[in-house]
């Protein structure tokens, strides 16, 4: 949970020492140089007007309850919902295509003339992107959006991820490449990262979670409620 300004400051500081910075700490296969791929083209308001909504690899009821309420509202207004991924109680009915790659592939190449005539949204979750073939799933989801004339949205679950991607806090090869040869790890509020026993770890954050327990040095950090900063939301909009 890191705002844009400290993410950029960390990038400048670490890269000046010859190091690497990586914000995709869960291994999400998000391409750093394509904002339409790591954010998408849809706005949250597009959900309200959508007649067709396709969910891929996400449980929005758990990952984004407010957005899920918008999907439910659209469903109550007559929208048709589809899901590729684990079945769950999302508080609305949906057509479950399946849980595997074949289910997603089966949706591509169909006749979607009826869908193209109406507003529609394809929503891709982080669960799908964290798979080893996440880039292929992303490409298929974007292809489905193109086939159906839909807006495309990547549903982020890390509040600081989009802003950090925007300022280039990424390393080729992702988190594994960034940690592979590190002697010192500066962990800025990434509580879910599992750092091996070798590197010296400096942790700066506000929560005594996994990151703090692994640290050799802990530096104090303000919680997001105690500081001013920019966060970029899942639709790519900066918020104070």
Could you tell me what each predicted segment is?
Residues 7-10, 14, 141-145:
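Short amphipathic alpha-helical coiled-coil/interface segments
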Residues 25-240:
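Non-catalytic alpha/beta scaffold blocks inside enzyme catalytic domains
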